[in-house]
């Protein structure tokens, strides 16, 4: 058949959990439920986030805030071209904002590097915007494109990130550009 990839349900992993026991039990249960067999040289893998969680090896929002404050003096911090994510990046952004007075967030547009769109290419064409030359402020972005929600998640990431920054106690400045210079 070739390579087969499966998502396997497992319990919520907490610090100190026996990850080996959980993984073995979870894949054996999935095998029994779904009727597939393991063969010599099959590989079972899990995301590093699961391992880190079981080891208690991750940074909290407060850890990130303390690090940002110590390294950048708690003033203005710039974050360039994050991937649009409610999970991984949002937690980091909370910590960054909690450790700074101001966060300048530069978002690439019309999409991030993995293809998550803020706005459609058609909308850019309609407004005559060249994403390789035009730098937009938040105000200009809203004037041109309004409040766009992600097709699959239904989230307006611009509004979401701005609110995360402000709720963490920092001033937010959001810029849309594709050249970090």
Task: Give residue spans per PLM region.
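N-terminal and secondary-structure boundary signal
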Residues: 1-181
């Amino acid at each position: 058949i070739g390579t087969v990839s499966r998502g396997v349900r497992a319990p919520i992993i907490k610090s100190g959990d026996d990850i080996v026991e959980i993984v073995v039990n979870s894949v054996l249960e999935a095998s029994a439920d779904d009727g597939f067999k393991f063969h010599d040289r099959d590989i079972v893998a899990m995301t590093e986030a699961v391992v880190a969680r079981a080891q208690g090896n991750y940074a909290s929002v407060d850890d990130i805030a303390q690090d940002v404050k110590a390294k950048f003096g708690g003033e203005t911090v710039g974050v360039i071209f994050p991937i649009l994510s409610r999970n991984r990046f949002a937690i980091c952004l909370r910590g960054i904002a909690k450790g700074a007075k101001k966060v300048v967030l530069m978002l690439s547009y019309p999409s991030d590097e993995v293809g998550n769109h803020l706005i459609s290419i058609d909308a850019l064409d309609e407004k005559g915007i060249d994403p390789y030359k035009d730098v937009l402020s938040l105000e200009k972005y809203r004037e041109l494109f309004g409040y766009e929600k992600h097709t699959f998640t239904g989230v307006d990431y611009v509004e979401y990130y701005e609110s995360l920054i402000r709720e963490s106690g920092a001033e937010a400045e959001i810029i849309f550009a594709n050249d970090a210079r």
